[in-house]
Amino acid sequence: MAASLPLVFTAPKRGMPPRHLADLDSAERKEAVKELGLPAFRADQLARQYYARLEADPEKMTDLPASVREKVGESLFPTLLTPIKHLACDSGDTRKTLWKAHDGTLLESVLMRYPDRATLCISSQAGCGMACPFCATGQGGLDRNLSTAEIVDQVREAAAAMRDGDVAGGPGRLSNVVFMGMGEPLANYKRVVAAVRRITSPAPDGLGLSQRSVTVSTVGLAPAIRKLADEGLSVTLAVSLHTPDDELRDTLVPVNNRWSVSEVLQAARYYADKTGRRVSIEYAMIKNVNDQPWRADMLGKKLKKALGGLVHVNLIPLNPTPGSEWDASPKDVEREFVRRVIAQGVSCTVRDTRGQEIAAACGQLAAEN
């Protein structure tokens, strides 16, 4: 195994983009408009353009006087993300976008269309500091946090692409957002929570998605899980557990050296109790590493004890990453694992894997141009 990378919780303080409308809450928007010498009603007008009409170019905002569009653009609508390329697979139902930020930082998002929904997987950091050895993003290290607006703009762009029929299947609606792209969302806590509020608030304060259709994933930053539980949000929490025992998890998910399996599950229980939401447990099935029958039994028992009925296990067939020595578990091993977890009274299914051939699946995002 390659030498392990250090854990990085604090991102370098560099490269953050200029202020954007999506960084601001309602009061801050009004103040920003006032600074520009515009009447207060323009604040809601601009927000409706961005959040309801999904328009980020003031030159196309026809209800805005032509004389102020340039000033508004410079002050509140800097170009945050420029698409470098789109890659599609799964008959066009999966589209990965490589974005370039204002400072040249690269990041990725993945739009997945299903018969009954459209889900966007978004990044919260450029790179990741959690150093999980089976994940391409974690092996690349952390460049920087994304701003609230950089996170929100990934969602606005996908919502516009769905509305305009820019993806296979014709026009539709973006229904779900998962913070499962690049980065550890809870290590960029303040901006991620602000982004969740923008994504879920109704216009003119946000994009109007249901909180229940938003999932925030974490490798298990226990104090931040508890903090999120107290935010008054009802988003789904997904915990990347990957093994039920501390000995292996210390290697697979290095943050386990800081917060053990039991501490993470206690925090998850607190989240479930506070929100009434079932917690998702993510488990990448790695051949001969974490797929043994006894680990399935232990996982089921620990989850049943910690979370009762407020838990669901998503088994994820390991997605290949460059240079990795690990493989996905065989299907018969996968099936037996599911059977054993369910036998302990815990809900468990295998996730439908999308985007593997364009390196858009879980653990594959590396933002390579």
Curated annotation (Swiss-Prot):
GO terms for molecular function: 4 iron, 4 sulfur cluster binding; metal ion binding; rRNA (adenine(2503)-C2-)-methyltransferase activity; rRNA binding; tRNA (adenine(37)-C2)-methyltransferase activity; tRNA binding. It catalyses: adenosine(2503) in 23S rRNA + 2 reduced [2Fe-2S]-[ferredoxin] + 2 S-adenosyl-L-methionine = 2-methyladenosine(2503) in 23S rRNA + 5'-deoxyadenosine + L-methionine + 2 oxidized [2Fe-2S]-[ferredoxin] + S-adenosyl-L-homocysteine; adenosine(37) in tRNA + 2 reduced [2Fe-2S]-[ferredoxin] + 2 S-adenosyl-L-methionine = 2-methyladenosine(37) in tRNA + 5'-deoxyadenosine + L-methionine + 2 oxidized [2Fe-2S]-[ferredoxin] + S-adenosyl-L-homocysteine. It is found in: Cytoplasm. InterPro entries: Aldolase_TIM (IPR013785), Methyltransferase_A (IPR040072), RlmN_N (IPR048641), RNA_MTrfase_RlmN (IPR027492), rRNA_lsu_MTrfase_RlmN/Cfr (IPR004383), rSAM (IPR007197). [4Fe-4S] cluster binds at residues 128, 132, 135. Binds 1 [4Fe-4S] cluster. The cluster is coordinated with 3 cysteines and an exchangeable S-adenosyl-L-methionine. Disulfide bonds join 121-362. GO terms for cellular component: cytoplasm. Its cofactor is [4Fe-4S] cluster. Residues 114-351 form the Radical SAM core domain. S-adenosyl-L-methionine binds at residues 183-184, 217, 240-242, 319. Its EC number is 2.1.1.192. Belongs to the radical SAM superfamily. RlmN family. Specifically methylates position 2 of adenine 2503 in 23S rRNA and position 2 of adenine 37 in tRNAs. This is Probable dual-specificity RNA methyltransferase RlmN. It comes from Rhodococcus erythropolis (strain PR4 / NBRC 100887).
